[in-house]
């Protein structure tokens, strides 16, 4: 059924495809034509509708009759109508606007008339009253109103005129619209008719679409019926196929069984052959071992021989070196050259030997082929092509010629080489050549290739050559007739001369080139490697009559690059032409030249061909640049153009002619090699060793080393020739002078110039010294093929007539808004008076001034100019680039223009402009809220921005403000900042706003705004300062202070009310407070939070408990840790020395230990620094005791804020905090002196933390602690109570401790459970309290196992042998643990579990039992050692598990239990193993057996009987091939099998822990239901 389901979709798809084809055929029938649909739609429409359609058709006919002119006229009329409508709308808007303005104008006139009447009435009233001033004023108002009235009248008249003109325009527009009203109506009707036509057409289209939809629906139903019929037919066909498949399957199974029987027999036979083959292989391996050992001995002899030769050669080299040094020559250079020559000779001899061997190989192959060919010729004599030389014949002729030429020299070289090299290398060469001859796969393939005929089928036995029938053969002589011979000779001669036919017209023979080519020269320029270039040639027939043309080809050296496409056109008349396509694909960057040869009827001709690479063609546009005459100081420039007309770019560089060029890479490398030759003396040893190695390997060099050998010879010759000139070449190049030259190059001096481009380089002429100036330059290029170009530059420098002797005017340091003056002197050397114009740059004209601005200087005289400088604060912005804002330096260029002189005379004004500002920082001081019981101090800074010192002082200070130090007066240096303290102490609650004024010596005032709020808090403290008595470390001092609420009445006039500034007074009632302690302070305040009622006070206790800083204790503990680690390392190093170095003296050992300690101390210190100390550690406690004894008294001060809030703290809801006001804050100052303690611990290095360590639960540990009274008086002791249910108990105590006396306290620790316990014991005296911290840990046993997953798999073992594996148990507790090992197979309760059903029956997922198959001999298959023992704390115990099976099984298992103290089971380890009879095993597949052995099975212990009884065991592998989607291929079914080999107990050099495993991957593709048998054949070899 699954097959049916998988095939049905495919059948449906096929049916759908057929139906779609039928539908496409039906839809393409004529009945679906649009015309037919249109005719049907017209027939179905009602008569009324048809009449409307007819009317529309008549309208359409009328519209069609309109000419193009009518349409154009209608279009223009529509545009005119739209323009008229737009103009009408605009004019209408404009008219309305004008009418509005006219109404407004009339309203203003009415208003002015009324105002005139009112003013006239007032004038009359004032005249009657006699108020002439008012009358005059009113008359002025009347005149103004009259003028306004006149203006309004004028405006009204103008508005009326504009309105009238607008109305006229409106009338004209309406007249034009009236004229076009008829066209507007006709156009509207036409638009409506067009809309009706479109509606009718839409209705027709709808009808046609509905008809088409009906046909589509009918086609769909037809396709459905066809698909149902097709599915029925496919179902019947599929059912028939299934029946046929079942029948075929039965037949196939019958034949398959027979085939499998034959295969089994064949497998048995192959297995026997395999055993025999393995036996032979083992014998070969044994023989190979013997030969390897013999070869090793031979190789050792050769190596000893080579070492002796190398030593002899080294002695000869040293002797030769001494002789050369005695003669005064360079021994190193001589030896290097000599060794190079020897290397080259050795390589040459090796190369010749190799050529000889290769020649012999080739000759032997050719002789072999010749023999085979002769043999074939005897069998099948060739019928044709006897005189044609084959490739093999050509090769044989070449080899024979080569042998004749090189036989004698080769023998001499061979003899010389054998005499010089000795027997060692020759033997190696023989071995290498024999290996090459025997193992070269290319030789066999070549032999096979050469053994085949050139034409397939010639050597086939069934091939018969073609024979001409006897009736077709004429009776002719063997050599042909005489006429045939003459014709043949003439034809051959004509073909050799390549003249086919001489052309003679009118008795005139054509002489010359038969075809002309256009172009005459085919030139491929500037080509790139890899690209393809194509060009066409036109060949024109220049002969007298018809001619032919044939392509012969290109020359030999062009055939790899040039391809000619030429289709012979046939006969060409005179003057006709044909085209030839030439394709050029360059593969080397090289110029090529040649010809393309053609053959015409009258002779041969060729077209020249040229291929040019990219080249540089560089030139300068001029070789001389003449600047002419210029005044000294002026600057001018010219440009020179470098042009590249070639197709290759390069790098250029413009240099002065005197500057040397940079050396190329090759030259630098040559110089470097020469330097190394003369200076690097250490290279001698490297060269000697490399020569000795290369001398041994020289016999194995190949032909590829010939090129490098020739290059080395050339290099040696060049060095020998250039050795005298070498010191000149290695001289240091002096850099060009840094002085300014008059003719220089511009910014662009080097760069890249591309192909077919040009670059302009500027040349700058700046005359400095009068006189003629000239310079030479050169242009160098990186491309060595480009020559260096040279050009020359000349110019003349002329001196100026006017100059300034002081070109720089220094005004020193100037302040803003201060006037500074100076005079500038101008000289002239001219013999005539000159007009001078003094000019200041426009940026500085507001700050600098030169007086006068214009003047005349007499001949050969001087002229003085006044300079005025008044810097303003806008100078940095105005000056721009002339002023440096960082350094405040002004460099102002001044210009003196001289008549008839191009270059002006300039001088510079230098000044350092600084400000006189003093800056107070911050700009505003806010003291905030300050109570009347305190003073607030804040710091301000005064910064001098000037570069000059200034005196200052704070003046007119308020009474409640003070400035310190020196009461705010002093002198501030340039750019200095002074710090001042401003102290503010209010006397009453109000807001304060005031200014601090700082006045400088130049009477400039700088003000600082200050503000503050005086606060009268509702609470006050009894005293604001507490001085504690001297308190010992880790002791406590307590002081009391009262918080008072003195606010009793809201209406008391004599007392000030609590308030914040000028706010309302605080409400009377309960007031709460809270003290905020600073972090990490030794202060404790109780209560820190409280409420005080009006007229009441609250007592507060302040406790002071000083302790040592944590950081200081850790610093003190670090040396102790370092010392302890050094002691441990010293003991560790001394232990082996005492055993091994008894004979050495004590001083030697001490020196060695000191060195070792010094080396080890550094890492230990770093390790201890990284280690984190705990307060309970011994080092920490010892360091604290040391610091306590050495503690020096100290004094600290703390300020504790107390915040105040209105209300009772009890009234708050839950944990809701009160709204404390930050302004009503009181401050309490504490003075805290600290001294050393009076009672200290003398035992345990003075530590106060005592750790009893790890104590087993139920055990008891006791410690004794000694305390001492270090004070000068006796002290009474009192002890705090310990937890009565806790593990700590104080066993003794005393009530008095004498001065300097010591007492021992005895403490015990008895844990009842595994916990970490800690308590404190306080020893109380009148001078302080000593606190002892007691710690201890109750420990339970705990171990860990090294086996992960609690499963130990012993793997596969050959039955009868054993294998061992180990694991470790580690004691992680701090106590020794007693352990014992138990196996479940040896347990007494094992028999109870065997009475139940087997595991594979009750639980299919878990097939095996915990205790699996056991040995048949009664011994346990698993054993463990040791069985019992004790593990020390932190130690590891090794255990060995031995697996010894006596028969084959895959289900050996057992469970190992680790029991502690014979009670507690700590770990359970599952032991597994498998045993096989053979060394090979296979894992994987489906199980075919059960994990429980049958009791009826009788083991076979005899190997001979076992082999007879043994059968092949099948492995069931089930592969599920699932295909989810028919469209996509499903992934192959995959199962993995592992084939392994078991190591035997035979001794071997290396024995790995796990067997060799090989995975066999089985894949199944396709729909396969048969069962296959896969046989694994493997070979067991002895491996390392």
Curated annotation (Swiss-Prot):
Write out the GO biological process terms: axoneme assembly
Q: Does the keyword Repeat apply?
A: no
Q: In this entry, which stretches build a coiled coil?
A: 300-379
Principal place of residence: cytoplasm
Bias kind Basic and acidic residues: ranges: 707-717
Which keywords accompany this UniProt record? Answer: Cell projection, Ciliopathy, Cilium, Coiled coil, Cytoplasm, Cytoskeleton, Disease variant, Flagellum, Primary ciliary dyskinesia
Biased segments, Polar residues type: 692-706
- Tell me where it resides: Cytoplasm, Cytoskeleton, Cilium axoneme; Cytoplasm, Cytoskeleton, Flagellum axoneme
Give, from the UniProt record, the effect of changing residue 1178 to N: In CILD49; uncertain significance
Role noted for this protein: As part of the central apparatus of the cilium axoneme may play a role in cilium movement. May play an important role in sperm architecture and function.
The record's family statement is:
Belongs to the CFAP74 family.
Tell me what this protein is called. Answer: Cilia- and flagella-associated protein 74
* Natural source organism: Homo sapiens
Lineage start: Eukaryota, Metazoa, Chordata, Craniata, Vertebrata
